[in-house]
């Protein structure tokens, strides 16, 4: 009986030891994730995991996994193993190739940035309800499922094949960029009360855009589309508006934009531009339109004006004493008045019909191109930078009938060969 008792005790001890060893192994498997090629077969993913192994023991502890709240992956082809990092709040994937992944595991995700091709042509973010920032650049993306009720503040979509995008449920959006999506022909961003920055550019068949009633909007960029209709009523706080290269745009109403400082509307078919309510304007780019007149008497802070290639016959910038750069070539101008504009450093007015040009009050002038006019004399004696240029730079007569002196991009002077230059 005694021996039987001892054997029983020994057997119990052995069993307990085995159980202890077995439980320890389970605990270890639960607590650690090996950083190896089996778990992370892609080289880029493997290196990303190694970067999270802070104690360099080739394992990821629970603490290391939980502390990984952001990850950057560049050039991966396989995202296998990413789901190990369950606490991620920010994921950035760049230069990915033929990727496919389900992001539903990341319930804490707040920021997602994807750049690359997506093999499934579909990205489903319906489970990521905490997302605040989404940026997707994927040239073969045809379907995007957004999370309902997510507190989105920033959204960027570029180079996709989507035919449209509906963001009307996300009224908290502050910044939206929709660029180079060739299948979109109409977009509506009306009634976004928090929207501050909107870029909708280089969408080559985009014909209609509604941006009305966005009271906080300050920056609007709609360059390089095919717009014929642009509704920006109810956006009275716009400070910067760029709508260049929309070849079907024939009108532009900026009367409500009293805070406007920058207006770039070049390469359109705009016939008239009323700036009488834009006293803060400092930069105006309106070249290659159909303007027959341009009233600048209400823009005293204007510093830069580029109105080349319009149908202007006269131009008066004398009400703009702050102007430094003026380009008005190829406009059929017979009159150009910039009296009192003593701060001008660059004047480009070639190929017009000017018979006189007085720059004696422009002591800082360093860039003057005035060839192709009807000038007989040119007095540069009060412009020391131009006088010095003629003394130090080589004379270039390669362009027939014209003389040019050039000092890199610093100074330039060009005039007709047969005029008298007073220096």
For the regions a protein language model found, what residue spans apply to each?
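Consensus "Asn ladder" position of solenoid repeat domains
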Residues: 139, 160, 181, 203, ...
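N-terminal capping/linker segments that flank leucine-rich repeat
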Residues: 2-4, 10, 14-15, 23-118, ...
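Ankyrin-repeat and related helical/solenoid repeat scaffolds used for protein-protein interactions
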Residues: 340-341, 346-398
């Amino acid at each position: 009986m005694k021996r039987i008792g001892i054997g029983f005790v020994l057997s119990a001890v052995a069993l307990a030891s085995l159980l202890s060893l077995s439980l320890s192994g389970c605990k270890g498997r639960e607590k650690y994730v090996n950083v190896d090629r089996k778990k992370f077969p892609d080289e880029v993913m493997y290196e990303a995991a190694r970067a999270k192994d802070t104690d360099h023991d080739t394992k990821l502890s629970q603490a290391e996994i939980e502390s990984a709240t952001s990850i950057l992956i560049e050039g991966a082809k396989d995202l296998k193993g990413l789901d190990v990092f369950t606490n991620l709040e920010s994921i950035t994937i760049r230069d990915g190739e033929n990727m496919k992944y389900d992001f539903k595991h990341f319930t804490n995700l707040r920021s997602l940035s994807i750049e690359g091709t997506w093999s499934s042509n579909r990205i489903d973010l319906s489970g990521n309800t905490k997302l605040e920032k989404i940026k997707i650049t994927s040239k073969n993306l045809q379907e995007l499922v957004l999370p309902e009720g997510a507190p989105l503040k920033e959204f960027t979509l570029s180079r996709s094949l989507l035919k449209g995008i509906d963001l009307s449920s996300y009224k908290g959006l502050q910044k939206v960029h929709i660029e180079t999506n060739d299948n979109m022909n109409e977009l509506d961003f009306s009634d976004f009360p928090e929207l501050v920055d909107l870029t909708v550019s280089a969408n080559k068949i985009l014909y209609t855009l509604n941006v009305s009633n966005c009271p906080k909007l300050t920056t609007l960029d709609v360059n390089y589309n095919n717009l014929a209709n642009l509704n920006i009523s109810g956006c009275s706080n716009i400070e910067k508006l760029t709508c260049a290269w929309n070849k079907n745009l024939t009108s532009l109403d900026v009367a409500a934009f009293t805070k406007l400082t920058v207006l770039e509307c070049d390469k359109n078919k705009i016939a008239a531009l009323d700036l009488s309510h834009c006293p803060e304007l400092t930069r105006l780019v309106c070249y290659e339109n159909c303007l027959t007149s341009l009233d600048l008497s209400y823009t005293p802070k204007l510093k830069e004006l580029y109105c080349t290639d319009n149908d202007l016959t006269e131009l008066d910038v004398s009400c703009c004493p702050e102007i430094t750069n003026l380009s008005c070539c190829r406009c059929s101008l017979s009159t150009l008045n910039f009296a009192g504009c003593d701060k001008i450093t660059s004047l480009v007015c070639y190929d017009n019909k000017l018979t006189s040009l007085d720059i004696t009050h422009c002591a800082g002038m360093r860039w003057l191109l005035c060839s192709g006019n009807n000038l007989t004399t040119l007095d540069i004696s009060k412009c020391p930078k131009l006088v010095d240029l003629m003394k130090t730079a080589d004379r270039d007569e390669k362009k027939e009938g014209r003389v040019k002196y050039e000092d890199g991009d610093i100074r330039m002077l060009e005039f007709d060969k047969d005029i008298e230059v007073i220096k």
